[in-house]
Amino acid sequence: MKFRFKLLCVTLCLALSAAAFTGCSGQGASSASGSAASASATGEETHEPGLFIDGQKVEADPVLTFNGEEVSFDLYRYIFLTFCDRVAGDDSSYWEDMSNSETAQAAETVKLYTLNNALSFPMFRQWAEELGVSLTEEETAEIAQVAADWEGYFGSEEEYENFLAINHLTKELAIQMELDTQLSNKVLEAAYGDAIKADVLENFVHVQHVLIQFEDAEADDHSAELAKAQEVLEKAQAGEDFNALMEEYNEDPGEPEEGYYFPTGVMVQEFEDASFALQDGEISDIVETSYGYHIIKRLPLDESYIDTHLLDLAADSSVNEQMQQDMDERIRAGEIWYCDVYDQISPATLF
């Protein structure tokens, strides 16, 4: 659990392909639309992939170009249907009634998000050329090996192919998206890495903590949790290893082993105030928030960690807003071509 009331992030859906493989459980996404990309009870798509207008499959490849560089139908379809799935959630009938004004508005929003994210692929490739950034042979080979290993997560080739189909992917597209993801990361690090690092070193704090969660946040009596927190505090003050105390007592399942890096305005106020008030190596008294009781230890900022997690840290960096503005401006400044049937793409026509 991270005690954030906001999360500013770099809005790149270039990582969607990697997210699709997280866990590799073999379970499919929810249906993209009630009539257009419905899933059966077994999780398999029941409609042939493609764009169907008036019942006829039509060619739409490429769907777009950006400064002359193509956005393939497969890429556009993947992004569009993935957004449709996320909007629909577990409601397999969500997209059935496109005459519903709320559904129609959601479809327009999905289409806008899809456009922006689809265009980011050629935008980043062109930006990489400007900066002289590229993937090394070793990086490309590593991605190819990872792609070759993906099938090993599944019991058979058929299961793997089914997983790809349910998630609107092909083998080739999954590999290309991973290549693009790594390239975009290198572009952002080249363009903003120094600024991100400087911001982290100046404005971030690094802490670990032990959380004793409230069993019932609404209860009037938290004496049992307070007693447990007091026990942890006494052990920490006596010099016991803080990592060992985290392993034994911590009830924050989202806390990484190295703890949290964050600036002001990210964590809940009590946690933030206590963290910034500490000196490196110092341990707080018991800090109460709406989540429970915390014992916080401040640690030095680790430059090697910062160097290898620049884009993760960028999400909370003041540089993030400038990054997003620059990416948006590059998209707006580009020359965009749309295929003839672009206006007819919707959750009711794209499968």
Task: Name these PLM-found stretches.
Residues 1-108, 112, 330-351:
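Short, low-structural-confidence N-terminal segments
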Residues 61-67, 101-115, 124-134, 169, ...:
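Second-shell loop/turn segments in exported
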Residues 63-73, 79, 127, 206-213, ...:
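Soluble periplasmic/extracytoplasmic beta-strand elements of cell-envelope proteins
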Residues 131-139, 241-248, 284-287:
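Surface-exposed patches in mature extracellular/periplasmic domains of secreted proteins
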Residues 231-271, 299-305:
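Peptidyl-prolyl cis-trans isomerase
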